[in-house]
UniProtKB/Swiss-Prot annotation:
Organism: Oryctolagus cuniculus
Catalyzed reaction equations: O-phospho-L-serine + 2-oxoglutarate = 3-phosphooxypyruvate + L-glutamate
NCBIfam families: PRK05355.1, serC_1
Protein name: Phosphoserine aminotransferase
Alphabetic keyword roster: Acetylation, Amino-acid biosynthesis, Aminotransferase, Phosphoprotein, Pyridoxal phosphate, Serine biosynthesis, Transferase
Cross-referenced InterPro entries: Aminotrans_V_dom, Aminotrans_V_PyrdxlP_BS, Pser_aminoTfrase, PyrdxlP-dep_Trfase, PyrdxlP-dep_Trfase_major, PyrdxlP-dep_Trfase_small
Family: Belongs to the class-V pyridoxal-phosphate-dependent aminotransferase family. SerC subfamily.
Inducers of expression: By progesterone.
Modified residues (N6-acetyllysine): 51, 127, 269, 318, 323, 333
The UniProt record lists the keyword Amino-acid biosynthesis: yes
EC numbers, comma separated: 2.6.1.52
Residue numbers bearing the Phosphoserine modification: 331
Signal peptide span: none
GO CC annotations on file: cytoplasm
């Protein structure tokens, strides 16, 4: 069956996968390339799986122009695993065992809290009353003795995105790119470590890609579990323990799809078009739809908004979500910590998908506006 599905999935992750990728997975599920077995059954030590993992790594390197002095590794544990792995691997780079954190939303806050288990954490700006903007980097209080500076490129819950790489005065920069990885080009050479869970823009849940500069390997704290130690995993070619084989395979297929559709630059162009369609409706709704994020820091990936007023009319929001569901549009409910509505526009979400939502939003506005 290759007929398009009726459901439009705006899920925040796990998220929509390209239809052609799903068909490829379906085609190869029982018999991978004539081997008579599924990737689900394949030994991670086999030459056939080595081809899969090498292909996925090579595509990451090609699509992001990853310099040769960086390792690309595939790990388990998701973004939360990396909240621990980053300090365990890097906070010991300097004797003071401290790190700078930029906290612009729920995920960077969670990362900073986890890092406190392993050293001293310095939040480089005054605590934000609400996560609706990125504090001006020129005001950040960077600690010259910090082992690294950490930030989250896109906050999925609050819809705040960096559209720039912060200048951290030569410090080692670590970035959680889980929710905008390969949605735009990135200069990898500006970072010490980049990590991203695959389940938003580049695949299915279960695998996290980590890009780490060679000179940062080998400084893990003594208590760092081996499965989280970058040097151990890099020297083992991500095979220190049994990796998430099927998720790595799916990621390879999605990366191939991104490559065939113009790469990161084309993804950014599409993301701009898709997000602008929704933001325009919000901004022209005379306060019916309200996005709390400052316009210059709005995310192209995740658009949170309230309906009726800035605090949200919950009855109206429920009606909106129920009606969207009737129209086969799913996973639009805002995160439980903020409420409201959230539209996630990852790479596989098409312009046609967004047009369908935009049309519904306009109709809903006309029906309920005074």
């Amino acid at each position: 069956m290759d007929s398009p599905r009726q459901i439009v999935n705006f899920g925040p992750g796990p998220a929509k996968l390209p239809h052609s990728v799903l068909l490829e997975i379906q085609k190869e599920l029982l018999d991978y390339k004539g081997l008579g077995i599924s990737v689900l059954e394949m030994s991670h030590r086999s030459s056939d799986f080595a081809k899969i993992v090498n292909n996925t790594e090579n595509l990451v390197r090609e699509l992001l122009a990853v310099p040769d002095n960086y390792k690309v590794i595939f790990l388990q544990g998701g973004g939360c695993g990396q909240f621990s792995a980053v300090p365990l691997n890097l906070i010991g780079l300097k004797p003071g065992r401290c790190a700078d954190y930029v906290v612009t939303g729920a995920w960077s806050a969670k990362a900073a809290e986890e890092a406190k288990k392993f050293g001293t954490v310095n939040i480089v700006h005054p605590k934000l009353g609400s996560y609706t903007k990125i504090p001006d980097p020129s005001t950040w209080n960077l600690n010259p003795d910090a082992s690294y500076v950490y930030y989250c490129a896109n906050e999925t819950v609050h819809g705040v995105e960096f559209d720039f790489v912060p200048d951290v005065k030569g410090a080692i920069l670590v970035c959680d790119m889980s929710s905008n990885f390969l949605s735009r080009p990135v200069d990898v050479s500006k970072f010490g470590v980049i990590f991203a869970g695959a389940q938003k823009n580049v695949g299915a849940a279960g695998v996290t890609v980590v890009i780490v500069r060679d000179d940062l390997l080998g400084f893990a704290l003594r208590e760092c579990p081996s499965v989280l130690e970058y040097k151990v995993q890099a020297t083992s070619s991500s095979l220190y323990n049994t990796p998430p084989c099927f998720s790595i395979y799916v990621m390879g297929l999605v990366l191939e799809w991104i490559k065939n559709n113009g790469g990161a630059a084309a993804m950014k162009k599409l993301s701009t078009i898709k997000s602008q369609m929704i933001y325009e409706i919000i901004d022209n709704s005379q306060g019916f739809y309200v996005c709390p994020v400052e316009p210059r820091n709005r995310s192209m990936m995740n658009i949170p908004f309230r309906i009726g007023n800035a605090k949200g009319d919950e009855a109206l929001e429920k009606r909106f979500l129920d009606k969207a569901l009737e129209l086969h549009m799913i996973s639009l409910k805002g995160h439980r910590s903020v409420g409201g509505v959230r539209v996630s526009l990852y790479n596989a979400v098409t312009i046609e998908d967004v047009q369908k939502l935009a049309s519904f939003m306009k109709n809903f506005l006309e029906m309920h506006q005074l």
